[in-house]
């Protein structure tokens, strides 16, 4: 399969999630010029880069994946989704660490509000659990040492220990409310607002006073 051969796992997750979302939304077809794709990812194709570095070390230049560039670029999750449905609307990738997915959804909603598009395929994906990234996260002190999975990842708890590595994708379909109602869509919810900011405190820690 050319799509699988030409994509990193992070993009494959996004494509699979987008297919499920589009199938569930009930549209007969997407308007190619009025549909946007906005996908968030923090790391992109780290697995492809790690595998190619390993092959380079063992085999030399001939071992490097010839498609490394198009597989590793963070924009290729959104790009592959647009390619699948031959879309010509706005195409964006959002990379804001742990906020990438929600920022992608919020950005897509604002694009609909501005009239840039009527529909948006929006969400996020990640597949960065390579040996080197997990070791680095552990050395940096990011990973939770808690063995109980129900207590290991509690980011908003005062007794939090750290984060856990995970991967996957989540994609939703945003649509102008009047259009969704007119076609009798099953509406799961309304996005009433969105905000994005930085606390300007630390590269990886939130300000403990919670002011931002």
Locations of regions flagged by a protein language model:
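Conserved beta-ketoacyl condensing-enzyme motif
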Residues: 1-96, 125-134
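Short loop segments at secondary-structure junctions
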Residues: 26, 115, 175-179
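A glycine- and small-aliphatic-rich helix-loop capping segment at beta-alpha/alpha-beta transitions
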Residues: 47-62, 111-114, 134-147, 208-211
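Short conserved active-site loop signatures built around small residues
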Residues: 101
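Short, high-confidence coil segments that cap the C-terminus of an alpha-helix
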Residues: 116-120
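Phosphate/pyrophosphate-binding betaalpha-module
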Residues: 124-159
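Condensing-enzyme catalytic core mediating Claisen C-C bond formation in acyl metabolism
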Residues: 148-212
